[in-house]
Amino acid sequence: MLAAAATFAAFVAVTSSAPDRDPDIVRKSFVIIKATPSYAEARTLALAAAERLAIRLDLRELVPDASVGLTFSQDACASEFGEFPCYVPRGRWDDGVYLSVEHSSSYEGFEEGLYVVMLASGSPRDRTIGAAVRRAKGQYPDVSVKTAPLYLGCIH
């Protein structure tokens, strides 16, 4: 009986009580200067913030699209995904500090239908996230950080 109890205790000790987690989904933090329904406003703000904060701007050659919010070019979509329009949210393999305009509908927990001026993306514990907030706070007092799950698996 004692041996069975010890075996059960050992089994419980090595068995995770947490549900299985999808290894292709990770949590990412995003430093946000502003979210707006206007792409033109978001783009103008991103350009100004890049100059004001002396931080690189990377719009990733995205353009507005009525059906998905933002899209890559028809050629890029066709060669990468086989269909148009297409959008891949920031944070998959491009973390760091740089300004971009992203579409909120691709981020779980973000208000839908907005263009988001992002200053940085990375792991929630990445020091660059806090550093980006501190750098922007003087010029953009409403800067915020949102954390969301992001799928890193195959999207073909």
Model segments located where?
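Acidic/polar low-complexity segments and flexible, solvent-exposed patches
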Residues: 11-156
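Hydrophobic helical h-region of N-terminal Sec-dependent signal peptides
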Residues: 2-10
